[in-house]
């Protein structure tokens, strides 16, 4: 249960809100490089923390993330001409570079210096491993981008996709870090599945009430969930939550790692970027094919859009016969299953009506950390992780141990999570 006041604080991310101000201290994932793949390609609309923006790649390959609306008469630059190192408004020809400088005002007298007095809101950008980030906070507080494990990987070793969910970012993240639901939502019916890649393997099916151990860190928290195995051993799954909305779920042995970014478009929509990768070899064509079909880590989208094929408008393509005989949910794909649960709670869930239990330990802790960080910032206390990219050089991990001990008491487990 969360009070209405705290729920508002947690979920409102627009300009001037405490949570929006906190998030603007961090580098924000905006879109994928392949969405603006070529110099002078058409601009792309993006919405970030309630701000309507466009992203474009100029003639020299530089990326701009700028206000969608021309400062002249506020017409949309989405319709603009991306040419000769700038985006030109087609209304009166005003042209701006990736830094927001006005390069040309052909509708003004030739001897006018007015263009030196007008700027377009523009945000610094950073591009890494196929993802474009923007920094929207105070310039003097801009820190280094986060050093995620996958940041320097070549293209053949990673695959990235983006899609939109129709709800607030917080409930998206809560659905991701909740390990207890795996034993139900992603499970099979009347069938034993030892293929843990389906998230319904013996460890999850055998112990459906995991023991939680959450460890706070400077970057966020490690979320440990322990399950008993049939052999009398203990399966620990350590997932990561990083400020302010990043997650990494521990992969099953042999599977690629996946890292997700739950970026608030506004109060009621979330842009999700998922990067799946392998550190030591290229991802396979079969893996990419499965990801594109939305079978596990990624969502299948309607071609030419960011809208998932399985969505609220078609009840996530639920198959009641499959639900009766094969799948606990009747919905195909982990992403679609999760989306059905978090979106069906409403655009912004009323958390004052919840009844939380021990299985919600990670959810409760994440809310407290975000609320505390937002309130601290209002008192002038800056978030540590915002300027220290090295804090993000950690990964998720899973293992089986013989003793019933907490994961953080084992040096080898803690070492395995460091990049």
Please provide the spans of the model-predicted regions.
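Short, functionally important structural connectors and interaction interfaces within domains
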Residues: 14-15, 22, 69, 74, ...
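Rieske [2Fe-2S] iron-sulfur-binding domain
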Residues: 1, 31-159, 211, 222, ...
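Short, charge-rich amphipathic segments
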Residues: 4, 18-22, 102-114, 294-309
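A short, structural micro-pattern
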Residues: 24, 119, 126-128, 256, ...
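A boundary/linker detector
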Residues: 1-24, 31
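C-terminal catalytic domain of Rieske-type non-heme iron oxygenases
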Residues: 15, 37-38, 62, 133, ...
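Alpha-helical interaction segments
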Residues: 16-17, 81, 86, 306
